[in-house]
Amino acid sequence: MSGMQAVWPSGTECIAKYNFHGTAEQDLPFSKGDVLTIVAVTKDPNWYKAKNKVGREGIIPANYVQKREGVKAGIKLSLMPWFHGKITREQAERLLYPPETGLFLVRESTNYPGDYTLCVSCEGKVEHYRIIYSSSKLSIDEEVYFENLMQLVEHYTTDADGLCSRLIKPKVMEGTVAAQDEFSRSGWALNMKDLKLLQIIGKGEFGDVMLGDYRGNKVAVKCIKNDATAQAFLAEASVMTQLRHSNLVQLLGVIVEEKSGLYIVTEYMAKGSLVDYLRSRGRSVLGGDCLLKFSLDVCEAMEYLEANNFVHRDLAARNVLVSEDNIAKVSDFGLTKEASSTQDTGKLPVKWTAPEALREKKFSTKSDVWSFGILLWEIYSFGRVPYPRIPLKDVVPRVEKGYKMDPPDGCPAIVYEVMKKCWTLDPGHRPSFHQLREQLVHIKEKELYL
């Protein structure tokens, strides 16, 4: 370890760069790709005391491991850093200057909307190859077909196959970073060879969620094949690298495969979504202590996001998962942004979203608090859809006039009071998650939920 490197504090996560078999009894052997947690620095700064995922402790060499970091906020990650979007033929030629054989980029076709153009510099000229999109496949010569642009570029990188040159050097779009490089740099890139995909456990618009095995551990894997969708999910994965809490679904790593897309690997939550868990068990199985525990689990996760200046924007029982040991964890960080961000998030779940967020796109921790109140109602109604018997188009006008849902059957009055505080129309008068957690802890300690 160089003298310049700062000492890693206890709790720092590292990922192994090489295998280490250990030479002394006190050493902790590990394999490349293992995640280790620093316990303490030793007298020799080149060695740390660390523990592995099963809790075994020992001494490790600092130069064999890499500190895991959050992917930097504000970086534009790209699976396709060579993709420049809507630029003209002339702009592409300027970008590929000075000429360098094999320098290339891909742009949207100006003459054929929906198609793409591969632009390749070759012996002082730029050749433009139309990429035809037909029957959900891409092709240049209508002989070889590809699922997506990444596959196509990968193919012509290994073999010119009729082009003027094979693709040698991507012209990276200014301001973007290749996703694979950034996940590797920050210690989150996993190896596809270590992952076995076992069975589909969920389907989404983006692709499949699969049960997987990563080095002997059960994991959940989001498999995203489509270029544009994968690009959107990169943002979710990069947010997850910055978050660590026992009530947030934990990212284990990311695999970027040119041939087959993006894989986001997270801890496996055996009991599925909280909304399904509540509906399938109901009042006869789940007592008041259990409902309050789930409420507190979610509140603690949200207090952590609040303290770290993140806004979830899509908090609902469908986006909370339940582990084998009945711990509720918040997931689905697809819309999560740093608090300062005001980006439009497209379609919003009307019944869960605060009025000011729907009306003015004003998202804040306080709009998450509104959603938490709706989630509490879901928990205490055992998974009912909020605002029963009110047509969707009438929900917002009624809420803005001050309408609040009645308490679910059997809901303790003190818990209903918490819900109503979350549904205060003025965001400034809603409680913080810190205050909400204190109120829920008080209810638990005094057994007021009975």
UniProtKB/Swiss-Prot annotation:
The gene is CSK. GO terms for biological process: adaptive immune response; adherens junction organization; regulation of Fc receptor mediated stimulatory signaling pathway. Homodimer (via SH3-domain). Phosphorylated at Ser-364 by PKA, leading to increased activity. Autophosphorylated. Its main location: cytoplasm. Residues 9-70 are annotated as: Interaction with PTPN8. ATP binds at I201, G202, K203, G204, E205, F206, G207, D208, V209, K222. The keyword ATP-binding applies. The modification Phosphotyrosine is found at Y416. It catalyses: L-tyrosyl-[protein] + ATP = O-phospho-L-tyrosyl-[protein] + ADP + H(+). PANTHER family: TYROSINE-PROTEIN KINASE. The active site is at D314. Non-receptor tyrosine-protein kinase that plays an important role in the regulation of cell growth, differentiation, migration and immune response. Phosphorylates tyrosine residues located in the C-terminal tails of Src-family kinases (SFKs). Upon tail phosphorylation, Src-family members engage in intramolecular interactions between the phosphotyrosine tail and the SH2 domain that result in an inactive conformation. To inhibit SFKs, CSK is recruited to the plasma membrane via binding to transmembrane proteins or adapter proteins located near the plasma membrane. GO terms for molecular function: ATP binding; metal ion binding; non-membrane spanning protein tyrosine kinase activity. Belongs to the protein kinase superfamily. Tyr protein kinase family. CSK subfamily. Its cofactor is Mg(2+); Mn(2+). Residues 82-171 form the SH2 domain. The lineage of its organism: Eukaryota, Metazoa, Chordata, Craniata, Vertebrata. The architecture of this protein is similar to that of Src-family kinases (SFKs) with one N-terminal SH3 domain, one SH2 domain, and a C-terminal kinase domain. One of its GO terms (cellular component) is cytoplasm. Keywords: Adaptive immunity, ATP-binding, Cytoplasm, Immunity, Kinase, Magnesium, Manganese, Metal-binding, Nucleotide-binding, Phosphoprotein, SH2 domain, SH3 domain, Transferase, Tyrosine-protein kinase. PROSITE patterns: PROTEIN_KINASE_ATP, PROTEIN_KINASE_DOM, PROTEIN_KINASE_TYR, SH2, SH3. It is an enzyme of class 2 (transferase). It comes from Gallus gallus (Chicken). This is Tyrosine-protein kinase CSK. The modification Phosphoserine is found at S364. It is found in: Cytoplasm. Residues 195-450 form the Protein kinase domain. The keyword Manganese applies.
